[in-house]
């Protein structure tokens, strides 16, 4: 079974078929996507692998999936680590496509296509709305921080001037996100269920719906790794290193972390009790909050899987306090 790696840029798609060693370049537009599909079907390709490229890969990946082809989108870091392990230090579009194909052959054959939300245009639209809101919030935060740091009154005024407009745009985004969820009953039903959890607000609920379609379908460890809050070991010989988190969906993790801070310190009695126990056992506050975030994910996962609302008397088993 041939595997094709596809290196993506805004304008082009560079594809490399591993078994037949054929390379082609296509425009990254609807016509190019059709040409790519036809070429893959002609080669009898079983798996196509894209590097995540800031969203430029989405439309092409959607075209492949609509044509019945298996398409994966992978973290570029994983491909670079694979290339370095293979001794490939040079970097061109064609070499990148070949390395992506090699990575796919080594790790993805036999697995279903992995593209979050791309087979669901309604979720994709919601994800873009949620992402746009986050861009506006980040921009506002950055301007405010810069304004706080300057001493010139004129510079401060210039930096603060756009904030009211950004506030209005964020409010508009909130209304659009709420409307998008309300229009789609599966999303609306999920939002109502998640809204029963003390400490979860509209922003975190929308992020969960948009960016975590796997909620309720994986076990708690898989879900924690997906979000990027699973503790990874760092041991060697007799040395036991400190556990640490890495990878995952950073934007989602950041939003859920802020929700957890409020839930574990003020709004959610279950998470408050867990946070207190972790601190009493010597955990640092940030480590304890990450553990509470994992607990929150475990609870949410069970609620969605069981189709149950929040019930503090029927919570799933979580990791021990020492974790």
What do the PLM-derived regions correspond to, one by one?
Residues 202, 207-281, 285, 312, ...:
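Phosphate-backbone recognition surface of nucleic-acid-processing proteins
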Residues 107-113, 143, 213-217, 262-270, ...:
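Short helix-capping/linker segments at secondary-structure and domain boundaries
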Residues 99, 158-161, 165, 189, ...:
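Amphipathic alpha-helical interaction segments
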Residues 280-323:
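Basic, amphipathic alpha-helical segments enriched in Lys/Arg and hydrophobic/aromatic residues
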Residues 147-203, 212, 264:
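Helix-hairpin-helix/helix-loop-helix acidic hairpins
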Residues 100, 136, 256, 282, ...:
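A residue-level signal for conserved active-site and pocket-lining positions in enzyme catalytic cores
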Residues 103, 126, 194, 208, ...:
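Short alpha-helical scaffolding segments that buttress acidic/His motifs in well-ordered protein cores
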